[in-house]
């Protein structure tokens, strides 16, 4: 865990539930512009990303992934604080896109954005550059520590498609959801099963085989071509949840 001095002057002990959302590959499909900027371990090459992938017209071509439906449900829950924690260096175009999609509020909105361009607000100046240039899991770990200070009584859930980030979140005691796997299952098209599955996967007393059997019914009704579009089978997804 990364223990570092922060600039926060108060915390929010009344917050009891925090959902932390990644952007790329979790709720936004930016693959068309961001994919060339990732290294073999899934970390963002910041220079390449900034120079090649951040043009306004490219950002406006991004699309939404199925998990955004669940995110919007959480945004409508007055008892839930939603955090966007992204590896991006957010530009005006990024914030505009979020507002355009109804994912960025103002004033008393129950969603906050933490990104590389907001580091200076929360961390000492001599640490910002080090955190900024860290790999994704390390970079987000600093924010995880900050969140625990800000919301000391909250139950946290991290939704991300980066396995290293999920492992880091788990080390802080956060619940985790593999966004790639969940989006795959949701995109099969059985919305009710998908949303119920997400809720049940967060419960402590899961019967994983029961969940696998339910998903298997969907899987068996698909053609081989349809199955090839997804990154894992239902049983493989269950195994991922067990690890998380």
From Swiss-Prot:
Induction: Expressed pre-early in the viral replicative cycle. Expressed with a few other proteins from the first step transfer (FST) DNA. FST DNA corresponds to the first small portion of the genome that enters into the host cell at the beginning of infection before pausing. It comes from the Viruses. Its EC number is 3.1.3.89. One of its GO terms (molecular function) is 5'-deoxynucleotidase activity. It catalyses: a 2'-deoxyribonucleoside 5'-phosphate + H2O = a 2'-deoxyribonucleoside + phosphate. Keywords: Early protein, Hydrolase. InterPro entries: HAD_sf. It is an enzyme of class 3 (hydrolase). Signal peptide: none annotated. Gene3D superfamilies: HAD superfamily/HAD-like. Coiled coil: none annotated. This gene is part of the long terminal repeats present at both ends of the viral genome and is thus duplicated. Following host DNA degradation, is responsible for the degradation of 5'-dNMP's to deoxynucleosides that can be further excreted. Active on deoxynucleoside 5'-monophosphates but not active as a phosphatase on ribonucleotides, deoxynucleoside 5'-triphosphates, deoxynucleoside 3'-monophosphates, or deoxyoligonucleotides. This is 5'-deoxynucleotidase. It comes from Escherichia phage T5 (Enterobacteria phage T5). The gene is dmp.
């Amino acid at each position: 865990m990364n223990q570092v001095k922060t600039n926060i002057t108060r915390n929010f002990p009344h917050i009891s539930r925090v959902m932390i959302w990644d952007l790329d590959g979790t709720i936004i499909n930016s693959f068309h512009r961001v994919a060339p900027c990732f290294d073999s371990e899934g970390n963002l090459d910041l220079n390449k990303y900034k120079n090649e992938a951040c043009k306004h017209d490219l950002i406006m071509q991004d699309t939404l992934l199925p998990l955004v439906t669940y995110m919007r449900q959480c945004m409508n829950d007055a008892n839930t604080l939603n955090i966007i924690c992204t590896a991006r260096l957010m530009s005006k175009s990024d914030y505009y896109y979020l507002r355009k999609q109804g994912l960025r509020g103002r004033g008393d909105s129950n969603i906050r954005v933490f990104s590389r361009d907001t580091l200076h607000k929360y961390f000492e100046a001599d640490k910002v550059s080090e955190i900024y240039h860290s790999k994704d899991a390390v970079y987000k770990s600093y924010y995880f520590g900050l969140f625990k200070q800000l919301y000391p009584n909250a139950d946290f859930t991290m939704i991300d498609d980066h396995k290293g980030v999920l492992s880091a979140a788990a080390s802080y005691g956060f619940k985790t959801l593999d966004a790639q796997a969940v989006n795959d299952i949701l995109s099969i098209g059985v919305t009710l099963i998908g949303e119920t599955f997400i809720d049940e996967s967060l419960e402590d007393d899961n019967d994983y085989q029961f969940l696998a059997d339910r998903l298997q019914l969907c899987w068996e009704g698909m053609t081989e071509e349809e199955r090839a579009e997804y990154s894992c089978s239902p049983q493989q997804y269950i195994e991922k949840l067990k690890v998380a």
